[in-house]
Amino acid sequence: MELNELQQQRLAKLERLRAAGIDPYPPRTRRTHTIGFVLASFDQLMERGEQVTVAGRIVGARRILGKLAFAHIEDESGRIQIWLSRGDIGDEWFDRFRDDLDTFDIVEATGTLRRTQRGEPSVFVERLGVLAKSLNPPPEKWHGLSDIEERHRQRYLDLIVNPEVRDVFRTRAKIVSTMRRFLDERGFLEVETPTLQPIYGGASARPFITHHNQLKQDLYLRIAVELYLKRLIVGGFERVYEISKVFRNEGVDRTHNPEFTMMECYQAYADYNDMMRLVEDLYRTLALEVAGSTTIVFQGHTIDFGPAWQRVSIPTAIAARTGIDILELTELEPLQRAIRAVGLKVDLKPSWGKQVDEIFSVYVQPELIQPTFVIDHPVALSPLAKRRPDQPLLVERFEPIVAGMEVGNAFTELNDPLDQEQRFLEQGRAYDAGDDEAQQMDIDFLNALMYGMPPTGGLGIGIDRTVMLFTDQPSIREVILFPHMRPRD
């Protein structure tokens, strides 16, 4: 690895430390308190004259004023000033602090607590130690890394210099733990299903393919966990859920990353109306837990999770917005003629169902700001959902939409094995016609359904998009620690 000039200067300082018998990367520390604890208990510790040892990264500039020096160090819990006097710490370590230590080095400082003349809580250092010498200097503006792509490529540096980014991921962890507790308290059992699958299914998406050398078998990274969880419902578990990574070989944009986190849950003897109530309760709980209120702000919109969510029917909304009655135009060519006739600016799609979805996505969904259940999806887009008894072109399905963004998907699950087989066959014909997102025939899943699956409601929630909402982040990359990035040129 070639070092630039600044790295070489830091390497020379590291070598000086080693030459003096100082290990710049010792195996352990003598830390007695976190910085956050010291700050919270500062006056009591100071009154007792208690000696503390804190540890953290040097942040900001070090200042040397004759026989005095000071800097700030930071650990995960907080930031505190350390104050060094040549008389207290001795010539060797005072000079070493001045000459061999740098911003971003990780140190430990032992001393007593006092406030400066300006009242700033400080550790007056009696002993200093090096815990990790940083060979990389901070960015030019140490207090912030502003290049978005570099922030995502070097998330470790982003976390060092932008404390608010750490807060986003603390909130993410809180959302996941709250969601898990919410489901546990309602009797759902957390389970684990295969990541490597011989047949991919449960969503309309292109998979990532890998190969098992010993079995000489192609396998797929899961695009969803639905079909395995429904097998468990067949097996007698009545409420199950899984929080897991799923993988879809698709584009990268503001709301899509090829690797993302989903929560899927299934409840026997329930339908999509029960899942709607579950979603309302879940997001209300998340809002109260994360924001302390049912109201949040996302990208300038005030979102209220307190009231019941509105319901919007796809055919009704499209008719109101565009004048097109999709239930009267149930073939692709007449629908596309109507699109051209009224001058809709949408991409033309290869199937009726996808064309309906395109119209809705462009002309209706962006206007759905308050929490909304979008219902009445075409059966052609929903091969795993139960048909509406009164309208066989549509299914009992909803998508929760917040601030114009889809955050999940839910059905009354199709449990008729004969109907399911026909849906799979239709998907196979679509695949043969060029739809590489069509779902695959899964004989074993059909066999499971033939043993009988009770009426079941199923729900999938995108964790990443949910975190976007509750942290007011404009892009999914801001809520994934290590998002997928294009290779450097």
Swiss-Prot record:
Gene3D superfamilies: Bira Bifunctional Protein, Domain 2, Nucleic acid-binding proteins
UniProt entry keywords in alphabetical sequence: Aminoacyl-tRNA synthetase, ATP-binding, Cytoplasm, Ligase, Magnesium, Metal-binding, Nucleotide-binding, Protein biosynthesis
Annotated NCBIfam families: lysS_bact, PRK00484.1
Residues annotated to bind Mg(2+) 1: 399, 406
Swiss-Prot/TrEMBL cofactor(s): Mg(2+)
Location of the protein in the cell: Cytoplasm
Gene name for this UniProt entry: lysS
Lineage per the UniProt record: Bacteria, Bacillati, Chloroflexota, Chloroflexia, Chloroflexales
EC code(s) of this entry: 6.1.1.6
Protein name: Lysine--tRNA ligase
Record field: catalytic activity: tRNA(Lys) + L-lysine + ATP = L-lysyl-tRNA(Lys) + AMP + diphosphate
Description of how the protein assembles with itself and partners: Homodimer.
Main location: cytoplasm
PANTHER family listed in its UniProt record: LYSINE--TRNA LIGASE, CHLOROPLASTIC_MITOCHONDRIAL, LYSYL-TRNA SYNTHETASE
One GO biological process term: lysyl-tRNA aminoacylation
Chain sites annotated for binding Mg(2+) 2: 406
InterPro entries noted in UniProt: Aa-tRNA-synt_II, aa-tRNA-synth_II, aa-tRNA-synth_II/BPL/LPL, Lys-tRNA-ligase_II, Lys-tRNA-ligase_II_N, Lys-tRNA-synth_II_C, NA-bd_OB-fold, NA-bd_OB_tRNA
Family statement drawn from the similarity comment of this UniProt entry: Belongs to the class-II aminoacyl-tRNA synthetase family.
EC class name: ligase
